[in-house]
Amino acid sequence: MQVSVENTTALERRMSITVPAERIETQVNKRLQQTAQKAKIAGFRPGKVPMSEIKRRFGADARQEAIGDVIQSSFYEAVVEQKLNPAGSPSIEPKSLEAGKDLEYVAVFEVFPEFTVAGFEGITVERLSADVADADLDKMLDILRKQNTRFEVADRAAQNEDQLNIDFVGKVDGEVFAGGSAKGTQLVLGSGRMIPGFEEGLVGAKAGEERVLNLTFPEDYQNLDLAGKTAEFTVTVNTVSEPKLPELNEEFFAQFGIKESGIDGFRTEVRKNMERELRQAIKSKVKNQVMDGLLATNPIEVPKALLSNEVDRLRVQAVQQFGGNIKPDQLPAELFEEQAKRRVVLGLIVAEVVKQFDLKPDEARVREMIQEMASAYQEPEQVVSWYYKNEQQLNEVRSVVLEEQVVDTVLQKASVTDKSVSYEEAVKPVEAPKAD
């Protein structure tokens, strides 16, 4: 077999491969022999069909199958011989497929970039520290109460935070539009569920009242057919209900699995959850800074095949998350390219750090992470057991731990500054970083 490789770009390779005709003929004959043993042809006993008849009937298909298999196997042999690491499937360009002659084809593909991760010393990280103060705990209890708000019908005009039961019909240019009408919809005023002006226009309304709202859809509205257009909504208020916060009592605590210990036990459990959230938030922010630093100090070119595959994965995730009747490939690729590039580049960099420093998942840390996650459940021992009985889930935890070990490796050489902040600041989400 003859192989030659041309570097067409930094990552693209054009590999010309010539396979001896004898190898093709051997594969063709092998298939014909297998076919002859099981072929059922009128006038012949099974296994007794002349080879000339087998070739006449099945020769073309056998050759096509043989060529496909030989291309696949010879491509693999060639990349091993040339010590290439393909990123994605090759594009095959046949040059000579004529029977009795050598098979010639060209495989065009990308390879993974070869690089050494460096620049740890130039990475700066601000590592936060915080405690859960009593005031933070009290604020969280208020949030939990609000999340479990009950609504009771009130005989008064609607206010912000009231829940209204409404019927409405929306029209654009006098015509009812799809998705613009509903009956018996529950709407909390001030929730921001509806377009600007809708909820505000119902403040002061009473049960049985009808209001007409003339509103304009935002220019960036998700339904492009309605974006920027003026609509008329006729709204009938069926009921007005006011919010009632639940008392901090045994009934309320039981909703969170706390059946004993009263308010003190409930506060203890909530504090534990807040401390767990705090640890995770601090760890996540340190990790994001490290990853940003690795991106900045290790610019690498991304194989287009990997980028395309990642865009496809993000499209599927978006459809699964937001639902709807849209197909993944209907979502514009450019919506996901920055995120896809960041994920692909970081995946390559992290893999290279693991390779350079010969990192292996620390099984003690794996168990510690599983126990930390399990502590959020009422039966933590069962959760731990479930992870260790599910190899796929266990390997996912190992991957997360390995990534943490990469972060620790970088932190050993990076410039790290410790900073004490409030609980609220420590857990506050940061804006998702973008790819360069």
UniProtKB/Swiss-Prot annotation:
Catalytic activity: [protein]-peptidylproline (omega=180) = [protein]-peptidylproline (omega=0)
Residue ranges annotated for the PPIase FKBP-type domain, each copy included: 161-246
Gene Ontology cellular-component terms listed: cytoplasm
A family per Pfam: Trigger_N
Principal location: cytoplasm
Biological function: Involved in protein export. Acts as a chaperone by maintaining the newly synthesized protein in an open conformation. Functions as a peptidyl-prolyl cis-trans isomerase.
UniProt-listed NCBIfam families: tig
Sequence similarity: Belongs to the FKBP-type PPIase family. Tig subfamily.
Protein's recorded name: Trigger factor
